[in-house]
């Protein structure tokens, strides 16, 4: 099937989004995508000078999806759980979004915009949450600091949760954080909510 040149760019992005989760962003190639879409080997280069330019679009789509998931609820704690759920469901995309493979996001305006929008969503939800708790007079820098702390916690807990997923059930950790995480495995949501509340304590 031939794709009309007018929508080839979006088709390439969507195909790359799927390929990212199926086989990892490292294995994406413009040549393979061109073959899958039945276009010439040079066609993708009319829209993306390099593979990294395409991967930046994939990462931007990831931030857009994560932001949308976080915006589905007005509850701040629930939006934090939505972040973790996204990161665990779309692990390859999340690695691309949060890793160093693309370098500075300033090279990719669309990606930078989506990444900033996701953080602003977290920050705004946090501010609304704190106001509901009676903290309506907090300085902006305190709110930003709290938002960054929550973001860092969620990023860290995702890494630990993924490590826990790959741990062998036949050889559970006997000591240390992995043992604790294994013990908490049936109550992740409760643990995450409690931890975020501790971070937000004022």
What does each model-identified segment do?
Residues 148-171, 179, 194-202:
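Amphipathic C-terminal alpha-helical segment
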């Amino acid at each position: 099937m031939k794709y009309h040149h007018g929508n080839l760019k979006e088709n390439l992005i969507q195909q790359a989004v799927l390929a990212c989760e199926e086989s990892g962003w490292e294995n994406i190639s413009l040549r393979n995508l061109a073959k899958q879409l039945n276009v010439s080997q040079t066609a993708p280069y009319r829209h993306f000078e390099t593979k990294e330019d395409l991967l930046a679009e994939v990462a931007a789509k990831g931030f857009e999806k994560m932001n949308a998931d976080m915006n589905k609820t007005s509850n701040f704690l629930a939006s934090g759980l939505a972040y973790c759920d996204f990161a665990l469901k779309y692990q390859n995309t999340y690695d691309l979004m949060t890793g160093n493979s693309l370098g500075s996001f300033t090279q990719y305006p669309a990606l930078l915009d989506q990444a900033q929008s996701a953080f602003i969503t977290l920050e705004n939800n946090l501010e609304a949450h704190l106001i509901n708790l009676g903290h309506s007079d907090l300085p902006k820098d305190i709110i930003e600091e709290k938002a960054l702390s929550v973001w860092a916690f969620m990023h860290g807990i995702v890494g630990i949760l993924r490590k826990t997923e790959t741990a062998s059930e036949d050889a559970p950790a006997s000591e240390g954080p992995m043992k604790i995480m294994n013990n908490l495995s049936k109550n992740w949501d409760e643990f995450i909510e409690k931890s975020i509340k501790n971070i937000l304590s004022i």
